[in-house]
């Protein structure tokens, strides 16, 4: 879990930490700066999805007083994600990024427990992953 109030942070030396969902979720610049020639980007939703910011902005308003930095990042999360996808698509056209994304999520959402739907999506992922070998060689 990543959102203050909904989840408890991990505290290290008195500083609360949450998972990376509020950070750079598509760190292409970092990967290339670290020396990668090519990047494989694995998405959990179809590549054409544009992330809406309505829910994030509402929650940001709720947590703003207690967690101002997290609220600021949460309010910008959709914008950052959409910009990252756009950049990934440009780099994919140049042959520098391979985007692996389901064409259909098979009804699977974050808390889905339907084993049949999960297996179907997993199998699609295995098939899609075959493109990685050709890309990195």
Residues covered by each model-derived region:
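Patatin-like phospholipase
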Residues: 1-137
């Amino acid at each position: 879990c990543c959102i203050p109030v909904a989840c408890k942070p991990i505290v290290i030396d008195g500083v609360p930490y949450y998972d990376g969902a509020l950070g750079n979720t598509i760190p292409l610049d970092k990967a290339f700066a670290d020396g990668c020639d090519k990047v494989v980007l694995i998405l959990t939703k179809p590549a054409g999805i544009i992330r809406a910011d309505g829910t994030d902005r509402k929650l940001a308003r709720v947590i703003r007083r207690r967690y101002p930095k997290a609220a600021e990042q949460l309010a910008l999360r959709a914008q950052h994600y959409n910009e990252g996808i756009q950049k990934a698509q440009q780099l994919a056209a140049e042959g520098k990024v391979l985007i692996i994304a389901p064409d259909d999520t098979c009804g699977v959402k974050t808390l889905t427990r339907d084993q049949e739907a999960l297996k179907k999506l997993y199998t699609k992922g295995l098939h899609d992953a075959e493109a990685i070998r050709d890309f990195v060689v």
